[in-house]
């Protein structure tokens, strides 16, 4: 799980990162450095010199990956390079809070990465409260964008849904998910 920004401008209600404010976008080399640093730490803990211990990467740490799109894509190409870390594109996931513009760009990128959507609510009223970006890209825009991504890439999309007691975990919420 790697970060794409220092801080985050989205301000999701359930995420501590938004409380720290947004400072800057990370460069591609800083994202790659997180993967290399994690591999070094894993080697140390396993007392191993073996490379390739990191096999999957998820852009889901601090920040909204789609708001640093160009650097994220550059880092993916570097991570995927056989002369570099050589992580298969299908082992890379980009998680977004629903930036439709970024999803549409990614759909045309010809990458085999997995798209993950931080959904957390099935109606705009609650989603506006939990994920302020929903005010810019409501579900009526997000869902067609996801469908177009699937159509163009033939890739699956995963949905993330944090259960918040008394907020989005009712039977009605569950029924809206299906």
Label the predicted regions.
Residues 1-37:
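Canonical Radical SAM [4Fe-4S] cluster-binding loop centered on the CxxxCxxC motif
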Residues 40-178:
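Conserved AdoMet/S-adenosylmethionine-binding subsite of the radical SAM
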């Amino acid at each position: 799980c790697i970060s794409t920004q220092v801080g985050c401008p989205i301000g999701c209600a359930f995420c501590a990162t938004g409380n720290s404010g947004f400072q800057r976008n990370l460069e591609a080399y800083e994202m790659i450095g997180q993967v290399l640093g994690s591999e070094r730490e894993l080697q140390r803990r396993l007392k191993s010199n073996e490379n390739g211990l990191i096999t999957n990467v998820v852009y889901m740490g601090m920040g909204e990956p789609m708001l640093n799109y160009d650097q994220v894509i550059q880092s993916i190409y570097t991570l995927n390079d056989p002369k570099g870390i050589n992580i298969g594109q299908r082992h890379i996931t980009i998680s977004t809070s629903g930036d439709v513009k970024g999803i549409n760009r990614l759909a045309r990128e010809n990458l085999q990465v997995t798209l993950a959507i931080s959904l957390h609510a099935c109606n705009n009223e609650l989603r506006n409260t939990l994920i302020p970006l929903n005010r810019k890209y409501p579900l009526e825009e997000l869902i067609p964008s996801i469908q177009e991504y699937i159509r163009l890439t033939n890739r699956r999309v995963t949905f993330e849904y944090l259960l918040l007691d008394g907020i989005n975990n009712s039977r009605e919420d569950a029924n809206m998910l299906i």
